[in-house]
């Protein structure tokens, strides 16, 4: 990833800058940026060949002697003999010689130096050509020397002085340019490193941003799911609360129903107890009447019995009528009530057993009669023992008197 970012960070302007810095680092100060050179020697040769401003200035300020013109003519006549290689550099030779003569005339000093010292880093072809031209010029100037013109030593000293000064200037310029190039190279490397760091930081921040966006989307999905779940749970909670309210209402209704049923049960129990007590009283009265009838049958006073029963009918009806709303006065006593209950239960059991034993005989002679007919009193002239034991009585005797039915 970092390698890709580094490759992307290289732009075309960097390549072009590197190409310019490596290929053509030096430019001509007079021609401008469109004229650039690969090395200082090429720039120096260009300046010497194309821009000779000092020579032109000296030529305009000073007047040349006729001997100088003759010397130039002689040198120009000897130049075609040097061949094709020396033809391109003939102009340089004339300019150098005229420059040396003018300088020696104006200043008039000389130094013993060698005329063949050349500047370092000059092309080999230029050095050879310049040396050959100087040798040829010296050989031509030797016989033409005159007392009024500068000598060869003065010319050589001036050339050496100019070369030394030019070399020092070029070296200073070279050092300055090299320092500036080194400084710019360091700054460029520093800026490139900073740019790479910024690119790496930008890529890292981009990755972090993408990661944050991904986490944000995941959290948004989780929040949406949580909101949906909360909504579903709220709906379920509402439904549960409504169902709970319905159940509570049902429970309240059921409690009311149970309370009403309990009240009805209590009332029913009370009514049943009253009914049983009334029934026991009636059974007790029937038992007393039966005992009385049996005692009358045993004594044989049937007539008195019928009259007595007719006289006792109102008294027997009274307890029954009173039992509907009021109990009999005898049953109000607790001891008598317990006694009556025990006697009533024993009598009911006894009557049930007797009925079960007499039912087959009754089915042979006549159809079954109602239980009330079993306790029907005998009429006048009718034997009571037969009616109790065997129920052998005629069909005409089945008619019940109204008084006996009301008693039971």
UniProtKB/Swiss-Prot annotation:
Coiled coil: 170-298
Origin superkingdom: Eukaryota
GO molecular function: protein homodimerization activity; zinc ion binding
Zinc finger (C2H2-type): 26-51
Disruption phenotype: Basket cells with reduced branches and short processes in the somatosensory cortex of adult knockout (KO) mice. Reduced expression of the gamma-aminobutyric acid-synthesizing enzymes Gad1 in the somatosensory cortex of KO mice. Delayed myelination in the corpus callosum of KO mice during the postnatal period, but recovery by adulthood. Decreased dendritic arborization and increased spine density dendrites in cortical pyramidal neurons of adult KO mice.
Phosphoserine modified-residue sites: 16, 139, 146, 370
Function: Contributes to genomic stability by preventing telomere dysfunction. Involved in the morphogenesis of basket cells in the somatosensory cortex during embryogenesis. Involved in the positive regulation of oligodendrocyte differentiation during postnatal growth. Involved in dendritic arborization, morphogenesis of spine density dendrite, and establishment of postsynaptic dendrite density in cortical pyramidal neurons. Involved in the regulation of neurogenesis. Negatively regulates neurite outgrowth. Involved in homologous recombination (HR) repair pathway.
PANTHER family in the cross-refs: PROTEIN ZNF365, ZINC FINGER PROTEIN
Assembly description: Homodimer. Interacts with NDE1 and NDEL1. Interacts with DISC1. Interacts with PARP1. Interacts with MCRS1.
Name this protein carries in UniProt: Protein ZNF365
Organism: Mus musculus (Mouse)
Highest classification ranks of the organism: Eukaryota, Metazoa, Chordata, Craniata, Vertebrata
Gene name as annotated: Znf365
